[in-house]
């Protein structure tokens, strides 16, 4: 059986940490930021972990 290919869209969106958790960027911080409050854009900074319900699905896309 050939090797399974990693889902290229998922590999660009998700990253696995050293402990095995999957992290992602938060949404709503790409464009049209001028009308959004600064508190909201600051809250959306950085990364967050993928929910436990989605972890299994994302793992299969990343061949985990």
From Swiss-Prot:
Gene Ontology CC: cytosolic large ribosomal subunit
Family according to the record: Belongs to the bacterial ribosomal protein bL35 family.
Biased composition (Basic and acidic residues): 34-46
NCBIfam families for this protein: rpmI_bact
Organism (species): Mycolicibacterium paratuberculosis (strain ATCC BAA-968 / K-10)
GO biological process: translation
Annotated segments matching region Disordered: 1-22, 34-64
Protein name (record): Large ribosomal subunit protein bL35
Keyword field: Ribonucleoprotein, Ribosomal protein
InterPro entries: Ribosomal_bL35, Ribosomal_bL35-like, Ribosomal_bL35_CS, Ribosomal_bL35_sf
Gene coding for it: rpmI
